[in-house]
Regions:
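Juxtamembrane "helix-exit" motif on the non-cytosolic side of transmembrane helices
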Residues: 70-74, 94-104, 153-160
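Membrane-interface junctions at the ends of membrane-embedded or membrane-associated helices
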Residues: 70-77, 122-142
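Transmembrane alpha-helix segments characteristic
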Residues: 76-99
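Membrane-lumen/periplasm interface segments of multi-pass, membrane-embedded glycan/lipid transferases
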Residues: 1-68
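Lipid-exposed faces of alpha-helical membrane segments in multi-pass integral membrane proteins
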Residues: 57-61, 88-96, 116, 142-149, ...
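Signature aromatic-anchored transmembrane alpha helix within multi-pass, membrane-resident enzymes
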Residues: 130-160
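Hydrophobic/aromatic-rich transmembrane helices and adjacent perimembrane loops
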Residues: 106-128
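Alpha-helical transmembrane segments of integral membrane proteins
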Residues: 54, 81-89, 113, 117, ...
Length: 160
């Protein structure tokens, strides 16, 4: 029987002497596919790019709102430091996902980025005045509706 590593060249690349850049040579769409699997399902080939652009823009806008609200608070050095540290943790999540692809398997790893949502939620909870703004609540609701709608219209039918 042929070992799994020989059947799939993207498995355990580090232990077989490949460099980190070889991961992206083996899977040049790694970032795009990881993002797609973060926002939806990797197996979904029918959803238009508009969904991923829209949800990405919403996430970035919501996160920027948290940052702006945090940095507008006077005399809140602790909050600003917390925001920077948490943002670095999110970057660390991405780095860990990349390293995982190198050490284990180079396929898209969007599921490993899900803790970023928890970190963003925590940061949002530190600026409760943000939720008093109708525009922020509306954008958050739209993101939620799109996500739940995707799950119901695409995710569930894909597996049944």
């Amino acid at each position: 029987s042929t070992p799994t590593e020989e059947l799939n060249p993207s498995w355990h690349m580090y232990s077989r002497g490949y460099t980190l850049s070889d991961v992206f040579a083996e899977n040049p769409d790694w970032f795009a596919m990881s993002y797609k699997s973060f926002c939806g399902l990797l197996q979904d080939h029918g959803t238009g790019a508009w969904y991923y652009w829209c949800i990405g823009l919403l996430y970035l806008t919501l996160f920027a709102g948290i940052g702006i609200a945090t940095f507008r608070q006077p005399d809140n050095l602790q909050g600003k430091i917390r925001f920077v540290i948490c943002t670095l943790l999110m970057v660390g999540e991405l780095a860990a996902s990349i390293v995982n692809s190198w050490l284990i398997e180079s396929m898209a790893q969007g599921r490993y980025l899900l803790p970023c949502i928890l970190i963003a939620g925590y940061l949002a909870s530190t600026v409760p005045e943000l939720f008093q703004k109708k525009i922020y609540r509306t954008l958050l609701s739209i993101a939620g509706i799109l996500s739940v709608g995707y799950f119901g219209l695409v995710g569930i039918p894909l597996f049944f």
